[in-house]
């Protein structure tokens, strides 16, 4: 039941925000940043990373992605590449303190007596792997766009 309510609320918020011109305001703000296009993408991913500390993936995907997708397209980036990069960024933020949703899910199924600090220490290699994966995807778009290009032309 919770997921349906979140889905409904996030969709309603996104529609109201876009209906009131919030998407145009955000697009204008992002495009006016004093960065090159890759800097704007990094700023979007950084904001997404920070939001991932506090919001679930459904909210972020339904609210943030539709707002930044036109900016990404206008900058000339592949939408498949950006969406995968966005998803990896979200996953990384879910592993990272201060909140770390994935860590608390793991704590719920871990045997009694394992402290959260041990789980935080154990997740560090996975965070490093996620960040390396993001860097690879960011610098070599073909890693994630080659297969869809082969499948869909």
Would you name each region that the model predicts?
Residues 3-153:
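Alpha-helical transmembrane segments of multi-pass membrane transport proteins
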């Amino acid at each position: 039941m919770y997921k349906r309510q979140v889905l409904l609320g996030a969709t309603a918020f996104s529609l109201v925000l876009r209906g009131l011109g919030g998407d145009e305001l955000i697009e204008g703000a992002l495009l006016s940043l004093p960065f090159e296009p890759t800097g704007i993408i990094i700023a979007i991913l950084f904001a997404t990373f920070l939001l991932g500390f506090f919001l679930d993936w459904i909210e972020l995907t339904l609210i943030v992605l539709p707002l930044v997708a036109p900016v990404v397209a206008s900058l000339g980036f592949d939408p498949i590449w950006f969406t995968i990069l966005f998803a990896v960024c979200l996953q990384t933020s879910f592993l990272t303190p201060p909140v770390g949703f994935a860590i608390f899910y793991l704590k719920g199924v871990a045997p009694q007596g394992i402290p959260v600090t041990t789980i935080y220490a154990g997740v560090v290699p996975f965070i490093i792997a996620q960040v390396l994966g993001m860097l690879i995807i960011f610098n070599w778009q073909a890693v994630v766009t080659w297969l869809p290009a082969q499948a869909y032309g």
